[in-house]
C-alpha cells in the first residue's frame, strides 16, 4: 500500500517525466485500469493507472497490454476529451494518496480547456475520476452511490472532493519544531 510520502515521490517523478507530453493513446485493458501512451521530450512512456481494490498502482512501463475490441464507456469518454491533450502538471493534494493529472486539450469548438484525471490510491476505495476545473465529476472508472458510501458520491455531475482527514499534518512542509512535536 502507498502512503502520502511515497505518492509525493511518485508525483515528483511523473511530473518530471510527463509534463509537456501529449497523450497519444488511451486504453482500458481491465475494468479498473487505464493505459496511457504519452509522447514527451523525455521519450515515449506508457503510464498504467490501476484502481484495483487489491492492488492499486501507478507506474511507467514498457509493456503493452491487450485491450478489449470494444472500448468501455469510460475509455471512450477519455478518448473524446483528452486524446491528444498535453499534460500540464502531475500533483498530489495535501499529502493524500492521490495523484492529480492536469491536462490541457482542445474542445469540439477548437478552444483550449483543461480537465483533471484524478487517481485515488486508497485500497478498496481506489478510483480514477475525470473532472472539470471547477471540480465537477464528468465520470469515473467506479461509480459510488449514496447506497455504497455515506461519506461521498462519485457520480457524473456531482462535486468532487477529498474526504477530510482528521488532523493530518504534512511532514514534508513542516518546519523542524513542528515535525519533532508531531513525533513526540
How would you label these PLM feature ranges?
Residues 1-59:
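Extreme N-terminal "head/tail" segments of very large remodeling/mechanoenzyme assemblies
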Amino acid at each position: 500500500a502507498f502512503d502520502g510520502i511515497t505518492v509525493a515521490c511518485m508525483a515528483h517523478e511523473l511530473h518530471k517525466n510527463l509534463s509537456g507530453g501529449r497523450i497519444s493513446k488511451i486504453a482500458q485493458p481491465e475494468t479498473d485500469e487505464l493505459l496511457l501512451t504519452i509522447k514527451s521530450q523525455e521519450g515515449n512512456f506508457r503510464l498504467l493507472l490501476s484502481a484495483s481494490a487489491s492492488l492499486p498502482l501507478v507506474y511507467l512501463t514498457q509493456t503493452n497490454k491487450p485491450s478489449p475490441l470494444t472500448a468501455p464507456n469510460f475509455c471512450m469518454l477519455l478518448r473524446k476529451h483528452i486524446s491528444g491533450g498535453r499534460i500540464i502538471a502531475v500533483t498530489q493534494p495535501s499529502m493524500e494518496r492521490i495523484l492529480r493529472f492536469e491536462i490541457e486539450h482542445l474542445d469540439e469548438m477548437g478552444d483550449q480547456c483543461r480537465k483533471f484525471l484524478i487517481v485515488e490510491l486508497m485500497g478498496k476505495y481506489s478510483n480514477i475520476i475525470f473532472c472539470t476545473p471547477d471540480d465537477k465529476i464528468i465520470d469515473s472508472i467506479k461509480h459510488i452511490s449514496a447506497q455504497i458510501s455515506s461519506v461521498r458520491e462519485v457520480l457524473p455531475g456531482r462535486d468532487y472532493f477529498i474526504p477530510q482527514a482528521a488532523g493530518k499534518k504534512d511532514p514534508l512542509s513542516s518546519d523542524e519544531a513542528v515535525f519533532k512535536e508531531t513525533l513526540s
